[in-house]
Amino acid sequence: MYSFQFENIVSLNDKSVLNNGCYLCVWHAHKIPPHIGLIIDGEYFSLKVKGKDTSIPLAEILKLIHRKEICTLLIEIKISVTRAQIITAFSQFSNAEAYRYSCLTPIADVFDLKQDVSMLADLLNSFKSKDQMGNVFGLNLISDFKGIPMYGIEEIEARLKALSKTL
């Protein structure tokens, strides 16, 4: 069962397309819950329990995904957003924390959807309903991958709590 199912996922043959525009990066897309970050013009941003990634060069992210064979989606977001907007949104948070902030929080802020989304499927459904989702690229996907697995807020909070115990 999926919380969001993709119609068409294509291979990323030309990584240079990620150097322009905005992409939602879904790490461990087959797991519950997945982790998300944002790519803007070839730079990566993400909020994690251990802190945050800001302005990480895309080449480093792709190298990690390839080396660890991480099941990843890169979803083109057809909304005009600037690097400055993303930096401002991420500057408000130091790290993800159970019952307060998740990796979704600053991303929802960037797109002014904080009140409307509480999980990745909500964000994806919002983009899809407004025709703001472009190409969906897949890297290291499992053979039968079709979409984001069904999960709830409880799984997100449990994962954040488990990760915070490893600090």
Where on the chain are the PLM-derived regions?
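Catalytic-site beta-strand/loop segments enriched in glycine and acidic/polar residues
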Residues: 18-21, 84-90
